[in-house]
Amino acid sequence: MKAAELARLAGADHGSALAARGQIAELALAARNASAPRTAVLRTAEPRSFGSVEEYARFLAGRTVCLTLLAGAGSRWVASLAAARERGDGRPFDPTRPRGLYPVRDFLTTREGGGAVPIAAYAIAATRDLGRRVIVVRGWEREIEAEILEPIDQAAAGHVGERTFFEQEAPFGKPLGHGDAAWQCRSLWAGAEYVVANFGGDANSRRTILSSLLALDALCACGQEADLLIPAARVPDPAYPIRLDEAGLPRDFGHAKLRGHAGASAGASFGYTNVGVRVYRASALLGWVTHFRSRHWVPGEGYSIPGNDAAGKEFALDNVDAMIAADGRARILAIARPEELTPAKSVDDIPAFERAVESVVREDRAP
């Protein structure tokens, strides 16, 4: 039974998921179609079947918001720009511009990496046609439109899709985390069925995101109690380790930034880590961002969340993930490739990022 197989791959048999990476979308399609009679009775999803993965994806795109968070300049990024200038390398770049606009090799509109596109173009392209876009920014909307969205439109011989820019407020001089960003823009995604969250500096794979979205919907249609699916990669010494229980369900997510520098597991061998992509049931995400805002917001100060770095005053999506996992309603799908865990957080990261996106885009283009 396809539903049981999909549930195993997102649970106890998580170690087999990567080998099935290329079949996950078809498996989710088969599981969803098999669930149609069940959903008609239980009303857990719209009771219909689909003739292809493409048809299934188009159906879900109408019920999904893709929430892409584009970072501002950031102190680490600005420092790396200054260091590159002192060394006489790196590309000329205004340090007040967002990191996501920094030019890197273009594998999206060319196959050889000729020309340049901004870093964030890869995250934007990875959610192409998967839902309505909400792009969280700190200004620079005109440049993002002209330098990222319009070129991707032209390369796709179509359009990136409906999109809305949202500027995250920074009440105390700095943004207070991506969880706070999700809360601030909640009116733009609360009416959706699913929210795909990703970040503008990551080497995202469209195949990973599509497979994860379809898998969560199929699991929900089959009666699985899941509010979050995180595509994961198996890597040595993960900085953001995922702890699984005996059933293969995630119970804890390590996050060094939130916990000071004590969050990472020192000396660990191979383990699972997230690659910066999350797929939520929108209703669950809305409930949890509202919970954190109402329970942990201190007027005039920021967030005070137990377990977080007290000095940061931030609210992260990782906090939401932890609560969903504690309720047993999170799943991992260990289909992500290690290349997807190659973010561009400093100028020194750019060569590795370019190698990673070349590999990721090549696979996404393959049949």
Label for each model-derived stretch:
Residues 103, 133-134, 232, 243, ...:
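Short, well-ordered beta-strand micro-motif
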Residues 2-146, 163, 168-173, 209-211, ...:
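N-terminal glycine-rich phosphate-binding loop and ensuing alpha1 helix
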Residues 65, 144-149, 153-247, 275, ...:
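Conserved beta-loop-beta/alpha segment of the NTase-like Rossmann-fold superfamily
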Residues 70-73, 168-169, 198-201, 232-234, ...:
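Fold-independent oxyanion-binding glycine-rich loops
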Residues 132-134, 194, 331:
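Residues at the starts of beta-strands that form the adenosine-phosphate
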Residues 119-123, 180-184, 256, 319-320:
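Well-ordered alpha-helical segments embedded in enzymatic catalytic cores
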